[in-house]
């Protein structure tokens, strides 16, 4: 029997919704990245985008372990000499909690030609509502929550 090689149109894509309330950010990012890549499917291949769509709600209620809100820094650079700026994760969570969660999930994805295509299937919302009810997303439960 020859080895099965999946093609781009062979897989059916589902929609999953993840509630980020009291879930540690790293564990949430791993679960979402695995769903986006399709690693839970028996037809997984690293060179084919066979993953599912992921909706993350309540990004403003995600948990951080330790003192990461006060001590972990996020950097950005303007491109000019001396243009390095840094903010704590706590400051970023007050303004844009959806971006913090999305950056953590994107950081868990591979950096290759498929990465942009995989990132387009991710939707992150700060509140409990999302505009994707027509897709009938399946609730995805993450077992471990913050203590």
From Swiss-Prot:
Domain of life: Bacteria
Gene3D superfamilies assigned to the protein according to its UniProt record, in alphabetical order: Ribosomal protein L13 (3.90.1180.10)
A GO cellular component entry from the record: cytosolic large ribosomal subunit
Pfam families noted in UniProt: Ribosomal_L13
MF annotations from Gene Ontology: mRNA binding; structural constituent of ribosome
InterPro entries: Ribosomal_uL13 (IPR005822), Ribosomal_uL13_bac-type (IPR005823), Ribosomal_uL13_CS (IPR023563), Ribosomal_uL13_sf (IPR036899)
Keyword entries, A-Z: Ribonucleoprotein, Ribosomal protein
GO BP annotations, alphabetical order: negative regulation of translation; translation
Function: This protein is one of the early assembly proteins of the 50S ribosomal subunit, although it is not seen to bind rRNA by itself. It is important during the early stages of 50S assembly.
The family this protein is said to belong to: Belongs to the universal ribosomal protein uL13 family.
Quaternary structure, from the entry: Part of the 50S ribosomal subunit.
HAMAP family to which the protein is assigned, alphabetical: Ribosomal_uL13
Protein name according to UniProt: Large ribosomal subunit protein uL13
The species this protein was found in: Mycolicibacterium paratuberculosis (strain ATCC BAA-968 / K-10)
